[in-house]
A protein has these predicted regions:
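Catalytic phosphate/metal-binding cores of nucleic-acid and nucleotide-processing enzymes, i.e., regions
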Residues: 1-117
Length: 117
């Protein structure tokens, strides 16, 4: 399986996990050659993800916007996620590790989740 196919398979597992856990309006940012221009008070920058951090967004059952960070076979770096949560009021983040390498996976890809608020 090439990287793009693995990413799509991981996204599918995360999407299924989100739906099973009653999240709604799930949207994943497509990874393309084109980047988005993000304008800030200090200038602008190019981003392939939402703020170069998130792979998607969804809504919780409580009506909160939840930012999604997905990785295959590793966890996302915590510092940028924790820094983002500190700056944004009412921010919720779900970080996913889709892997077959941890104990209990038995060679099958499984979804592991960390949350930040």
């Amino acid at each position: 399986m090439n990287n793009r196919e693995r990413m799509r398979a991981s996204n599918k597992l995360v999407r299924e996990w989100l739906l099973q856990n009653e999240y709604d309006q799930i949207w994943f940012k497509p990874h393309t050659k084109r980047t988005d221009v993000v304008f800030t008070q200090g200038g602008k920058y190019l981003a392939t993800d939402l703020w170069n951090l998130f792979d998607g967004i969804c809504l919780s059952t409580s009506g909160f916007i939840v930012f999604l960070q997905m990785k295959t076979n590793s966890w996302a770096k915590e510092k940028p996620l924790k820094d983002f949560v500190k700056k944004i009021n009412g921010c919720f983040i779900l970080s996913f590790n889709v892997t077959n390498k941890l104990k209990g996976c038995n060679g099958k890809y499984k979804v592991f989740v960390r949350d930040y608020q």
